[in-house]
């Protein structure tokens, strides 16, 4: 009987876990739908800013102010800025692992070349994984809010702008997961600085803006950095929720399989006990 009690307790425990994983799956699915809508709206903005930047730089009719020139600087004696985007929570498959693995590999490569490194880490999981081996390289750490927040984007942008303005870094690469669908996310590293300068005389006629040259370039740089950070944050958030939704769906299905096996084992144990009792009763009646 004690074996039956243990089986019932275990079945109850697995059912409880199944309810939790199912709830988490539904929450992630709901969040993912909202984020996908945000991505759809932001894609147009990112493309528009990139096109505007390309047009102005191709025209090459403006004098670049000193502060703006720092964002096009290709000097190699400055630090490499790595922006690492992870999550606050786990239970999302290999979402964080792939990012952290790539960052560690790249940091070790840069170290072997004797290059300077600065890390900006977003998300508790990334900070926990990178703090011990690379604490001296960490410049900033930002916690992720529960929902996509423009304040976080502005804080990261201001940090990047300050580091570039102070001539501490010459290039900036963002590490994030690019969202494809709920089951597929690809680890992506995207270099956003230095900004490449183009020259194409065919673009000159298209460059017709009311801003003064210096203000235009500086404002475009601000918008460009903003759009790139916002894009990466949204992609990473969607990838996190998609990965968690898939992981929780798999966990729910596994729990269902375990419950079926335990119920089958429980029924067989009960049948064995009943059969044993019947045999004892029959044997007793025959003895009488």
From Swiss-Prot:
Keyword Glycoprotein: no
Signal sequence, start to end: none
GO MF: ATP binding; proton-transporting ATP synthase activity, rotational mechanism
GO cellular component: plasma membrane; proton-transporting ATP synthase complex
InterPro entries found in the cross-reference section: ATP_synth_F1_ATPase_gsu (IPR035968), ATP_synth_F1_gsu (IPR000131)
BP GO terms, sorted: proton motive force-driven plasma membrane ATP synthesis
Membrane topology per record: Peripheral membrane protein
Pfam families reported for this sequence: ATP-synt (PF00231)
Domain of life the protein comes from: Bacteria
CDD domains recorded: F1-ATPase_gamma
Cross-referenced SUPFAM superfamilies: ATP synthase (F1-ATPase), gamma subunit
Keywords for the protein's UniProt record, in alphabetical order: ATP synthesis, Cell inner membrane, Cell membrane, CF(1), Hydrogen ion transport, Ion transport, Membrane, Transport
Compartment annotation: Cell inner membrane
Function comment: Produces ATP from ADP in the presence of a proton gradient across the membrane. The gamma chain is believed to be important in regulating ATPase activity and the flow of protons through the CF(0) complex.
Assembly and binders: F-type ATPases have 2 components, CF(1) - the catalytic core - and CF(0) - the membrane proton channel. CF(1) has five subunits: alpha(3), beta(3), gamma(1), delta(1), epsilon(1). CF(0) has three main subunits: a, b and c.
UniProt record similarity statement: Belongs to the ATPase gamma chain family.
Protein name: ATP synthase gamma chain
């Amino acid at each position: 009987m004690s074996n039956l009690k243990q089986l019932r307790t275990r079945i109850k425990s697995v059912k409880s876990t199944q309810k939790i994983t199912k709830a988490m799956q539904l929450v992630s699915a709901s969040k993912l739908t909202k984020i996908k809508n945000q991505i759809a709206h932001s894609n147009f903005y990112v493309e528009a800013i990139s096109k505007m930047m390309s047009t102005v730089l191709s025209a090459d009719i403006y004098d670049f102010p000193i502060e703006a020139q720092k964002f096009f600087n290709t000097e190699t004696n400055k630090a490499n800025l790595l922006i690492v985007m992870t999550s606050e929570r786990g239970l999302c498959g290999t979402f964080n692992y792939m990012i952290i693995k790539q960052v560690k590999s790249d940091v070790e490569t840069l170290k072997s070349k004797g290059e300077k490194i600065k890390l900006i880490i977003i998300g508790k999981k990334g900070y926990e994984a990178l703090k011990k081996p690379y604490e001296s390289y960490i410049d900033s750490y930002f916690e992720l809010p529960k929902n996509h927040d423009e304040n976080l984007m502005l804080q990261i942008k201001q940090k990047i702008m300050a580091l570039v303005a102070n001539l501490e870094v010459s290039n900036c690469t963002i590490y994030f997961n690019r969202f494809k669908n709920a089951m597929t996310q690809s680890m992506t590293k995207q270099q956003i600085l230095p900004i490449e300068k183009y020259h194409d005389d065919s673009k000159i006629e298209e460059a017709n803006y009311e801003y003064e040259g210096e203000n235009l370039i500086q404002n475009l740089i601000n918008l460009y950095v903003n759009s790139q950070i916002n894009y990466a944050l949204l992609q990473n958030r969607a990838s996190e929720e998609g990965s968690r939704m898939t992981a929780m769906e798999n966990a729910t299905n596994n729990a269902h399989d375990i419950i079926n096996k335990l119920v089958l084992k429980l029924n067989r144990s009960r049948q064995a006990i009943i059969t044993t009792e019947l045999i004892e009763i029959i044997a007793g009646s025959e003895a009488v």
